[in-house]
């Protein structure tokens, strides 16, 4: 039995938790971003800059939806296959791909993890934006005992980051 599931989940109308679970209050607002090489920052700033470029996204994710809606019409190729984040970063740094679409927190983590010999970031975020429906991350909480969701929501209110 799992009491709390946390995996960057957003409440969608068609994402049902069943009778014994509820969504928590939101704990984080995600902005969409593209992770790119630092050397490309001056030329890759907005959707039209990605014409002819390759953007990798996780299949069926918010990044995939965003890629199809925001960058594909501008002429970008959207590739929805992620063998691993390490492999995607390797492809990005070697120039095999041009960007990795993710939420800002995930891409910020990757950018901070890959530094040059001077401690400077090799990767940076660009085109940070919210989707039409704001992405509010929530926890899936077992609700057999109503005290658990109440306690979690109380904690989230005290530590609000939105």
Model feature map: region roles:
Residues 1, 17-21, 90-92, 112-115:
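Short secondary-structure transition/capping segments
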Residues 1, 23, 87-91, 97, ...:
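Short, hydrophobic alpha-helical packing/hinge segments within bilobed ligand-binding/sensory domains
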Residues 1-49, 121-132:
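Acidic, polar ligand-binding/catalytic clefts
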Residues 6-18, 66-70, 97-133:
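A ligand-binding cleft/hinge motif common to bilobed small-molecule-binding domains
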Residues 10-11, 30-88, 104-108:
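Bilobed "Venus flytrap"/periplasmic-binding protein-like clamshell domains
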Residues 38-42, 48, 53-62, 131-162:
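Extended ligand-binding regions for polar small-molecule ligands
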Residues 73-76, 87, 94, 143, ...:
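Surface-exposed, polar/charged faces of alpha-helical domains
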Residues 89, 93, 101, 149, ...:
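Non-transmembrane alpha-helical segments in soluble domains
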